[in-house]
């Protein structure tokens, strides 16, 4: 998943998993 730093995904609030 493309998270990053608090992405709009609402799940990944860190590294790009």
Swiss-Prot record:
User: What's any GO biological process attached to this entry?
Assistant: neuropeptide signaling pathway
Highest taxon of source: Eukaryota
Q: Where in the cell is it found?
A: Secreted
Which GO terms label this protein's molecular function in UniProt? neuropeptide hormone activity
CC terms in the record's Gene Ontology section = extracellular region
**Leucine amide PTM positions:** 17
Question: Mind listing the UniProt keywords for this protein, alphabetically?
Answer: Amidation, Neuropeptide, Secreted
Question: What family is reported?
Answer: Belongs to the pyrokinin family.
The role this protein plays is: Myoactive.
UniProt protein name: Pyrokinin-5
